[in-house]
Amino acid sequence: MAEQSPESSSPTTWHFAEAQKLTFGEPVTELRVRLVSGTVNVVAAEEGPARLEVTEVDGPPLYVVQDGGTLTVSYEDLPWNGSQGLKQWFETKPWKAWAGSASGRKAWERSVAITLTVPAATQVHVAAVGAAVFVSGISGGTDVNTVSGDATLVGLSGRVKAHTVSGSVEAQSVSGEFGFHSVSGGLTVVDGSGGNVRADSVSGDMLIDLAADPAAPEPVDIFLNSVSGQVAIRLPHPADAKVEANTATGRVSNAFEDLRVSGQMGAKRITGTLGSGAGTLRATTVSGSIALLRRPQADAEGPAAPLTLDKKVL
């Protein structure tokens, strides 16, 4: 049951120990969520105040605080310093004396399922351990940090950053600057129209599918780096970029006649200029393969086929 702080001059707090719905009376401009297990959905509202729907609580109560325009949804014992802070909490706390409770439950044995509806211009920060994250329609900037849970990002604009340890990220129709960092998680970008992508992963695969925005076309600005992950990039038609793609031991595949493939044994490169070379594409992997693909023309019949990694081709 929710408990509201009686002091209106101080931050307003609630504790959710069961399923509950709440509509916030004060405007929300920044959202901070940090959770362990379960699901978190953040959806942009077309109009009206911010809302929270808690459909499941298993473990300690969910702690909600509204301090001015900042709304925080979390637990009282969780740190707020991104995925590394959550990872350290998860790795160290279970082995400390306080980890057990009178009920026999361990500190990390908790789960919630929540949906937050906020104005599209809200700045959104989500940090989670083992929770599935879904964010849709946000234009105020989105920052997602996960330890092992996967994240799905749909229709976002503004700056988007995703940092994972082992979770994968799928970004659909993202139009802002996009940054991704992971140890072993993969990245899939579908119909990305922003053209600005910075991504690095140690072993995760990267599939980048870009679609030009006819209303405001921008040159691509792509920098990808991986150690052992495979990289596949599909560029919009017509493509316009200076290209340099390298792999030390992997295979290469190139669909553009204007690009040159060099290297027979060992290191291989794809280099050259597409169109006027206004954009930049740089991709590097040590042992993974690289594929540069051509997206069908915008007036071609039907949507472009989904981009997948074909290890037989790569």
Residue locations for each model-derived region?
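Intrinsically disordered, low-complexity terminal regions
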Residues: M1-T164, S168-L314
